[in-house]
Amino acid sequence: MKNIMLHVCGLLMLVFAWLACSDSPKAGRTLRVGFVPAEDAQQVMQNAQPLVEILRNELGMEIQPFVATDYTGVVEALRVNKLDVAFLAPASYVLAKNEANIKVVLKSERKGIPFYYAALITRADSGIKTLEDLRGKTFAFGDSLSTTGHVFPRKMFKEHGIDPVRDFKQILYSGGHDATVLAVLNGKVDAGATYANSPDNEDTAWMRYLKDPQDVKKIRAIAFSEPIPADNLVISEALDPRVAQKLVDIFLELSRDPKGKKMLRDLYQIDGFVTASDKDYDSVRRAFTGAGIQLKEALQKKKS
């Protein structure tokens, strides 16, 4: 009888141990984190490593980072449940929300402001001063699903009666903000679309990617868009709610910590996060309409 009781107690202990492990959000899980390639994908992966380490340590989970070759790659990975959490640009989020079972939880801030801008840039010596001056010129968009590198600039052009296909001499899709800035600086194109964190030329893409202050002075903004709700963090609805809440807590804490702020700025030139909701991005949905871009068609064209 004593041996039987020992076996029973042993089995009960194993059962309780298994239940405790299965109840833990950390048990046997790999968290798959997606990053949009706002710049060179390898550079994004490198900049993401400190964050990956923090998530690994704080969650006690293995972290699997994924940087797509373009914005569509992250949207598609969310659609087929290959990611648990992802950093998305506003336009990518609007597309992903239509395709995937996701929820936006946080949006980024820059200098305490949860907005940023599309900026149309040229060389300071180009003679181009207005959008009308772009007719007959060469122009670089970023990724075709980029918020500031394509969607909002297209809306700006349409509002001014400019059809890039008809009115520009040549259109280039650079694939990233860094490439667009360099294309303009080096004279590969006459002008291009990128981002600025403020419309006062104090925190811009060309300041980030051009290390020589003299090169920065060679770039001038022609126009800025309306304020755009900032890029965000989304989670899969299938993710354990406890892990999801822990992620939110981690990013909010990073937003309050000077070292955390630097890490986020190195990654996507942001300073922190605040809570977000889907309705925050209604203006981006309107921008697609204003640009004459259908959501479904935008994603299908990119896939093909």
PLM segments and residue spans:
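Pocket-lining segment of extracytoplasmic ligand-binding domains
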Residues: 138-242
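Bilobed "Venus flytrap"/periplasmic-binding protein-like clamshell domains
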Residues: 28-29, 33-54, 58, 68, ...
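An extracytoplasmic/periplasmic, membrane-proximal ligand-sensing/linker region
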Residues: 28-50, 235, 239-304
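Short helices/loops that flank or line small-molecule/ion binding pockets
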Residues: 72-86, 99-100, 132, 177-197
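Bacterial N-terminal signal peptides that target proteins for export
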Residues: 1-9
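Bacterial signal peptide processing site
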Residues: 22-24
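C-terminal motif of bacterial Sec signal peptides marking the signal peptidase cleavage site
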Residues: 17-20
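Acidic, polar ligand-binding/catalytic clefts
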Residues: 76-133
